[in-house]
Structures are given as structure tokens and as C-alpha cells.
């Protein structure tokens, strides 16, 4: 996190918004927390330019919990997964406890060095699940699938790193820790029409509707994590919003990619150029011996 955000957080650990209590001490049922929660949702809604047709919820836990929740809420018959690497594969395997899952495509044939652009969607499929950015293999969607089933997207590792049309998704979820704050929580943006199709034959705690109905306070919310998200959103806004952040990210990633491309083969990028991630630059050296020295 930026040093100016950390300095602000340091002060709020002893006195949050003039309460005389630190952010880790305030009650999660207090007006000051509710104000901060509402403000955080408003930041997200404004920054993502979301239609009114979306709900925003915050939950304890990270990505692994969301692998479970997406499956147990929306998998009635079968779910399609774009196999672009480890995280989509883990999500599919977890959801398989609740119904049939299958790969709508796969990049396994080339060790996940690219993003496939065709999708085999079978009848009675409830959704297509994708991972926007693949940290291990260094690939990232530039254009998103246009399919006739709800589109669910894990954006944990590139959320709010660039300007995109967030309204093209039926659900987006992200662990906060990658780009936007402290580890231990996730948030989800879910289209109301998809929520209406969610299963109710699962424990109440695992239902997204439970968090919607209780404004993310069905149980003790991850107060500090939400607070760090709030401060990061405030910082992004002050930096000029997503357009400015995207330009910064392009410059930073470009410095490394240019070094790889101009190395005469000493460094070899893993991902296809058109699918390169702006968040995670992956490369190998010319020989295994050089990699050991590196």
C-alpha cells in the first residue's frame, strides 16, 4: 500500500474519525462503522460505474471461500469454467461438490501461456466462470467473453487496476489483499437477477442473499479489512481514478516487458504478447543453469 495510506492508517489505529477509539476498537454495530461501510460501497459503485442493478457485499475469508460460495449459490445443474490456470482450476474443483463442472476451454496445451477466445457452453449451464488475471502464468483478459449464460469473474489480482466495463459481468468477486488492502476479506458485486436464481438449500451463512439482506453484517464483518479498502479507494480516487491508475500500471509493467523483449533472448517471456498481464510479469531465462544462478 502507498506510504501515505499507511501513515493515515497509523493515525486511525489510535483515533478513528474523532471517536477517541482506534479503527480496531470500534463496534461493528456503531454508526461510525456503518458510515464507513456505506462510504466504501459508494466509492466502489462510483469507481466501477455500476448500474443500480447490482448489490455489493463484504465477507470474511479470501478467494478459497469464494470458490465455494460461487458454486454452492449458483450451480444447479452444471457450471462452465475457462481453464486458464491454477485459480480457475481450484474454483472448478471446489464447485464440483455441488454439481457438474466442466472446462469451457483450456490453455493447458501450451502451459497456460495464452487466453483462449472460444467457449464450448453445454446445455443447462448455469454460468461461465473466469479468472481475469492469472498470477502464476502472467496472462490477463483484454476482452471478456460474450456468452448466453451469466458471467462470473474472479478479479482478485487485477481489480481496479484498469478501466473496463464492469456492467458486462453478472458477478465479480475479489479478495481485498491483492490490490486493495489487508488480507482476510473479499467483496462481491452481484447482479440482482443472478441473486434471484441463487440456491436456498444451503446454510444461511453461505448464501449471498444473507449478506445482502443484512448489509454485510450478518455476522461480525471484517472491520479492519473494509477500512483498508476504504482508504485505498480514497487514494485511487485522489490519484485520478482508474484511468490514471491504469496509465501508472502500464508504465511499470512496460519497463519490465521492454527489458525482456530487448534482452536478445536472455529473458524469455512466458505469456503471449497479446495476453500479457499488466499485474504479473512472468519470464524464464535462456537455460536452466542460468535460472539457478538467477
Question: Language-model features: where?
Answer:
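Conserved PLP-anchoring active-site segment centered on the Schiff-base-forming lysine
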Residues: 75-89
Amino acid at each position: 500500500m502507498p506510504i501515505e495510506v499507511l501513515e493515515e492508517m497509523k493515525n486511525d489505529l489510535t483515533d478513528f474519525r474523532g471517536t477517541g477509539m482506534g479503527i480496531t476498537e470500534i463496534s461493528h454495530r456503531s454508526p461510525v462503522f456503518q458510515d464507513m461501510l456505506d462510504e466504501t460501497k459508494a466509492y466502489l459503485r462510483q469507481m466501477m460505474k455500476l448500474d443500480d442493478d447490482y448489490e455489493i457485499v463484504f465477507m470474511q475469508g479470501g478467494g478459497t471461500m469464494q470458490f465455494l460460495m460461487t458454486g454452492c449459490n449458483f450451480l444447479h445443474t452444471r457450471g462452465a469454467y475457462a481453464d486458464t490456470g491454477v485459480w480457475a482450476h481450484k474454483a472448478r474443483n471446489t464447485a464440483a461438490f455441488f454439481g457438474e463442472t466442466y472446462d469451457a476451454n483450456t490453455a493447458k496445451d501450451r502451459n497456460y501461456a495464452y487466453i483462449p477466445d472460444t467457449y464450448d457452453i453445454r446445455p443447462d449451464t448455469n454460468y461461465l466462470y473466469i479468472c481475469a488475471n492469472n498470477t502464476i502464468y502472467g496472462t490477463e483478459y483484454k476482452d471478456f467473453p460474450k456468452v448466453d449464460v451469466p458471467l462470473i469473474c474472479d478479479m482478485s489480482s487485477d481489480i481496479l487496476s484498469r478501466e473496463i466495463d464492469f456492467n458486462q459481468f453478472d458477478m465479480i468477486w475479489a479478495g481485498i489483499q491483492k490490490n486493495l488492502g489487508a488480507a482476510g476479506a473479499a467483496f462481491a458485486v452481484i447482479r440482482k437477477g443472478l441473486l434471484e436464481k441463487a440456491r436456498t438449500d444451503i446454510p444461511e451463512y453461505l448464501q449471498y442473499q444473507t449478506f445482502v439482506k443484512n448489509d454485510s453484517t450478518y455476522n461480525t464483518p471484517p472491520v479492519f479489512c473494509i477500512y483498508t479498502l476504504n482508504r485505498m479507494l480514497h487514494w485511487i480516487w485522489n490519484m485520478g481514478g482508474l484511468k490514471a491508475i491504469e496509465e501508472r500500471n502500464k508504465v511499470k509493467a512496460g519497463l519490465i516487458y521492454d527489458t525482456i523483449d530487448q534482452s536478445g533472448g536472455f529473458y524469455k517471456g512466458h505469456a503471449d504478447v497479446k495476453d500479457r498481464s499488466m499485474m504479473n510479469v512472468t519470464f524464464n531465462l535462456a537455460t536452466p543453469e542460468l535460472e539457478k544462478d538467477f
